[in-house]
Amino acid sequence: MKEGIHPEYKETTITCVCGNVITTRSTKQDIKVEICSQCHPFITGKQKIIDTAGRVERFNQKYAGVNNKKA
């Protein structure tokens, strides 16, 4: 392998909005996530509303002018 072309692989902390902190190694410095293994709805069995309004609004704006005609 060539030297000097690979990104630096360093210790990283992954922080979830629930407060869980995971230490691992990555090429990124610090990573912030919305859902982790401690608060994921499938694992905890609790219902959690995930905000996807931004994506839905962008989709609706993008396809607002498209007619719903079937050929």
From Swiss-Prot:
Biological processes annotated in GO: translation
Family, as annotated: Belongs to the bacterial ribosomal protein bL31 family. Type A subfamily.
Pfam families from the xrefs? Ribosomal_L31 (PF01197)
Q: Where does Zn(2+) bind?
A: 16, 18, 36, 39
Note on how the cofactor is bound: Binds 1 zinc ion per subunit.
This protein is called Large ribosomal subunit protein bL31
Which positions are tagged coiled coil? none
Ranges annotated as spanning the membrane? none
Instruction: Alphabetically list the UniProt keywords.
Output: Metal-binding, Ribonucleoprotein, Ribosomal protein, RNA-binding, rRNA-binding, Zinc
Q: What is the documented function of this protein?
A: Binds the 23S rRNA.
Does the entry feature the keyword rRNA-binding, yes or no?
yes
> What gene is behind this protein?
rpmE
State a single Gene Ontology molecular function. structural constituent of ribosome
Which cofactors are required for activity?
A: Zn(2+)
Query: Could you give the subunit structure recorded for this chain?
Result: Part of the 50S ribosomal subunit.
Q: Which organism is it from?
A: Syntrophus aciditrophicus (strain SB)
- GO CC terms on record? ribonucleoprotein complex; ribosome
